[in-house]
């Protein structure tokens, strides 16, 4: 008798994606982040759903409804902090996942990579609108500053901003629509993630060597299911350490002050995972230029397959490219630090140099280095 899991219309899909899927025998822990992102998404949707049961998206009651969740709802505090810190874990996994793709040349799977970049943008949009919902000072001013960037678009900018706001400033209409966006976007992310997986399974996974592994495949279950479970346990451990011991470590104290349009906080800054992009935005003294640099800093990922000049796919056997990659990582950490600093000497110049270096490494140094490596190997 043929196994039901191989014939049943629904179980067949699950079977081909998670059980009998042929996987390379040598994928390292860097390949765990895909499943971890899936777990993060499920966790965020579940905690978010329970928060939405008690949250009110009205300027008069939003802040106090979040306080009510933390004080009066059974285990509301843990749900709230799991959701807030879950977003941080989500972005840690995202950055690791993208970094893995860059290092091992996974961007040569064009459809998978491009859907991934769209996913990154969507997750960033979701996190941004979500940060506005508690209606604290940083929520309000963050929303004001970031949405205001759209006014840099020539001709239609001002109209566009007022259309997004639903008025002449960030107010009740803005909060209500941001809640609606924040509710719907995770489901769009889930759908996109399925498409991402669909395209990945057309080609099969890459592996650390970047060499086709068709000759040496193993079934996904039990080898990688057990490996993923270990990754999930570590993720949950790290998340719960954060939630139970330092829930406000990554948050901004200003967000414990209710939103006040008459009082601007001294330093407006987004959550830590946006600081690198915020630093790039601030490093350009022109508004439109800053916005373009901000968008380019993420959109540049789409160019990665075009900028790949090496005859090898992975960086595993390319020491010079490896050095550049880790310099890029250090540069991004520098930008993250600068994004959280006030706009004054020496931070301005450090931010500008780090921003220039970021684009210079990706657009100039990496392709040149790859070509040099080809020549050294007489390829």
Curated annotation (Swiss-Prot):
CDD domains: cytochrome_b_C, Cytochrome_b_N. A ubiquinone binds at residue 201. Signal peptide: none annotated. Binds 2 heme b groups non-covalently. It is a multi-pass membrane protein. Pfam families: Cytochrom_B_C, Cytochrome_B. The chain crosses the membrane at residues 33-53, 77-98, 113-133, 178-198, 226-246, 288-308, 320-340, 347-367. GO terms for cellular component: mitochondrial inner membrane; respiratory chain complex III. Its cofactor is heme b. InterPro entries: Cyt_b/b6_C (IPR005798), Cyt_b/b6_C_sf (IPR036150), Cyt_b/b6_N (IPR005797), Cytb/b6-like_sf (IPR027387), Cytochrome_b (IPR030689), Cytochrome_b_C_euk/bac (IPR048260), Cytochrome_b_N_euk/bac (IPR048259), Di-haem_cyt_TM (IPR016174). One of its GO terms (molecular function) is metal ion binding. PROSITE patterns: CYTB_CTER (PS51003), CYTB_NTER (PS51002). Gene3D superfamilies: Cytochrome Bc1 Complex, Chain C (1.20.810.10). GO terms for biological process: mitochondrial electron transport, ubiquinol to cytochrome c. Component of the ubiquinol-cytochrome c reductase complex (complex III or cytochrome b-c1 complex) that is part of the mitochondrial respiratory chain. The b-c1 complex mediates electron transfer from ubiquinol to cytochrome c. Contributes to the generation of a proton gradient across the mitochondrial membrane that is then used for ATP synthesis. Belongs to the cytochrome b family. Heme 1 (or BL or b562) is low-potential and absorbs at about 562 nm, and heme 2 (or BH or b566) is high-potential and absorbs at about 566 nm. This is Cytochrome b. It comes from Cervus elaphus roosevelti. The lineage of its organism: Eukaryota, Metazoa, Chordata, Craniata, Vertebrata. The gene is MT-CYB.
């Amino acid at each position: 008798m043929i196994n039901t899991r191989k014939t049943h219309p629904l179980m067949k899909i699950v079977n081909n994606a998670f059980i009998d899927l042929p996987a390379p025998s040598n994928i390292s822990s860097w390949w765990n982040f895909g499943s971890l992102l899936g777990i993060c998404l499920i966790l965020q949707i579940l905690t978010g759903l329970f928060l939405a049961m008690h949250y009110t998206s009205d300027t008069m009651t939003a802040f106090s409804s979040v306080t009510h969740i933390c004080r009066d709802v059974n285990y509301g505090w843990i749900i709230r902090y799991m959701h807030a810190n879950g977003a941080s874990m989500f972005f840690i996994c995202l950055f690791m996942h993208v970094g893995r793709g860059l290092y091992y040349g996974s961007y040569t799977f064009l459809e998978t990579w491009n859907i991934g970049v769209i996913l990154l943008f969507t997750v960033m949009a979701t996190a941004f609108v979500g940060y506005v919902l508690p209606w604290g000072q940083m929520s309000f001013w963050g929303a004001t500053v970031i949405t205001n960037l759209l006014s840099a678009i020539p001709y239609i900018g001002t109209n566009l901003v007022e259309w997004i706001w639903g008025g002449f400033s960030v107010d009740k209409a803005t909060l209500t629509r941001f809640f609606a966006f924040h509710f719907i976007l995770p489901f769009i992310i889930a759908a996109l993630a399925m498409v991402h997986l669909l395209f990945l399974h057309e080609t099969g996974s890459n592996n650390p060597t970047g060499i086709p592994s068709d000759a040496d495949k193993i079934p996904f279950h039990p080898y990688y299911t057990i490996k993923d479970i270990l990754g999930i346990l570590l993720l949950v451990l790290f998340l719960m350490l954060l939630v139970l011991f330092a829930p406000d470590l990554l948050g901004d104290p200003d967000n414990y002050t209710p939103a006040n349009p008459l009082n601007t906080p001294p330093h407006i800054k987004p959550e830590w995972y946006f600081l690198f992009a915020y630093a790039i935005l601030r490093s350009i003294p022109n508004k439109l230029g800053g916005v373009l640099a901000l968008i380019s800093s993420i959109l540049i990922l789409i160019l990665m397959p075009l900028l790949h000049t090496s005859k090898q796919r992975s960086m595993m056997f390319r020491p010079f490219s490896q050095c550049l990659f880790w310099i890029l990582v250090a540069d991004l950490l520098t930008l993250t630090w600068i994004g959280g600093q006030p706009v004054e000497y020496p931070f301005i110049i450090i931010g500008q140099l780090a921003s220039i270096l970021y684009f210079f490494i990706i657009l100039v140094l990496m392709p040149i280095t790859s070509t040099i490596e080809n020549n050294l190997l007489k390829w």
